Amino acid sequence: MLVAATLGTSFSCVCPPCEAPGAQGAKPAAVVPVGSRLVVWDGEGGGIEGGKSWADCDKKGACKATLAPAPKLGKDSTNGLKFHAEGEGWQGAGWNWFGWWPETAGTDFRSYTHLTLWIKVTPKTPELAPEPGALGFLFGCSAGKKSSGSVVLGKYDKNLFDGQWHKVTVPLADFYVGKEGAEFDPGTAWEFRLNHWAGAPRNFDVILDDVAVEKQ
């Protein structure tokens, strides 16, 4: 199923991008990087406003995938962003911090070097935890609606699946490798995505908080 969640808006949207009803006038400018850290999600108004989410899975009728703001589930009992995955096969979701509008919106990542985020992975039971090598993270850009290369989050923290909060740091260069990474435009980044695949049924939540790009 494909579902969408919104934050601070009165209409819904699903992936692929759609135009806001009644949108008129000049398009807002892209977010210009300022300083050494740019937050795209913190759930408390410190990120980029107007974001929306999508979620989907490939075993229709036997899988679930959702991504939505989750009050009090963040790192400091603030608002987290919860990805729920259930069933076998592929589940994926994304948070577009522009809400897909305007279609040419984007944030310029080129002056930043690293992604940082806080993450907590909680399975329904231990045997239903995600595959350690199968929980991926990637970006999307508005230019050509391309995806970056995907990284395996477990590679950057060997204890990622212990049910506790972890700060994960990933060099942005890791997203720019391979064919997809070469086609991705870091000058128009506008979405981050999670994905997972397993051959056996899984049931788990991933909570994200304080998602940012930094100069390190």
Which residues make up each language-model segment?
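Extracellular ligand-binding interfaces
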Residues: 88-181, 200-207, 212-214
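Short carbohydrate-recognition loop motifs
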Residues: 68-96
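Short, surface-exposed ligand- or partner-binding patches at beta-edge/loop junctions that are enriched
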Residues: 181-193
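Bacterial N-terminal signal peptides
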Residues: 1-10
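Short beta-strand-plus-loop segments that form exposed binding edges in beta-rich domains
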Residues: 193-201
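Extracellular carbohydrate-recognition regions
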Residues: 18-63
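Bacterial signal peptide processing site
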Residues: 14-16
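Short, surface-exposed loop/turn motifs at beta-strand boundaries within globular domains
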Residues: 34-36, 74-76, 110-112
